[in-house]
Amino acid sequence: MERPSLRALLLGAAGLLLLLLPLSSSSSSDTCGPCEPASCPPLPPLGCLLGETRDACGCCPMCARGEGEPCGGGGAGRGYCAPGMECVKSRKRRKGKAGAAAGGPGVSGVCVCKSRYPVCGSDGTTYPSGCQLRAASQRAESRGEKAITQVSKGTCEQGPSIVTPPKDIWNVTGAQVYLSCEVIGIPTPVLIWNKVKRGHYGVQRTELLPGDRDNLAIQTRGGPEKHEVTGWVLVSPLSKEDAGEYECHASNSQGQASASAKITVVDALHEIPVKKGEGAEL
């Protein structure tokens, strides 16, 4: 019996392929069927906040999904992400059974912003991502307000503000005392301490600390949070000359802020009044 030639085998394989192609294309078209806009589910009365997309068959309009909302999947509930986002399958599903492999029919994920870094909006607000900025802008426009645009990447710059001001202190000569102050701002502020001398007509002058004082030290460190700075004034031993008003002053390119507290020096503990100012310390 003669073996079939290579040419005959190739011709037979090509013929079989031609027979199978119409079957696959007809099954795909049968899934969608003719487009009938009248049978499409209605959109929300106020429209789609993130815009519209089309269903899997390209027929019915549907609302685009936002960040963190489900996407993918199969059937009528299939969702598509808004522009600037991508549908990401969970690791559990990717490691699951073969029938639930990533990209397979029926597999769903969540919409994730492609740009995953903070941005500064024209309203002075820092948004975790460009997608959240666009969503906020669309909400503003739906209320008849001005659109929000991206000013820059990263967090918005802001002037310093006092997180924890220094507190008034009462103590005896020879003691060790300290004042502390915590500030925040973007860029991170520069913190300095001044001793303020006031007269009858307001501030007379300020003395930048530590100056030439042997019993006074200044310490500053970043934190505890990002863009925060904490500073201390340590006085040891305390003398009568150290009494007065001390100012915590913070500044950056966006502005400045300050807060002050007083150190009161007495000769004996019994001289300290029972009721001191709110926030005062020994």
Curated annotation (Swiss-Prot):
Glycoprotein is among the record's keywords: yes
Coiled-coil region(s): none
Keyword annotations of the record: Cell adhesion, Disulfide bond, Glycoprotein, Growth factor binding, Immunoglobulin domain, Phosphoprotein, Secreted, Signal
Annotated Ig-like C2-type domain residues: 160-264
Pfam family, one: IGFBP
Record flagged with keyword tRNA-binding: no
PTM section of the record: N-glycosylated.
Modified residue annotations for Phosphoserine: S239
Oligomer status and interactors: May interact with VPS24/CHMP3; the relevance of such interaction however remains unclear. Interacts with CD93; this interaction plays a role in endothelial cells angiogenesis.
Function summary: Binds IGF1 and IGF2 with a relatively low affinity. Stimulates prostacyclin (PGI2) production. Stimulates cell adhesion. Acts as a ligand for CD93 to play a role in angiogenesis.
Entry protein name: Insulin-like growth factor-binding protein 7
The encoding gene: IGFBP7
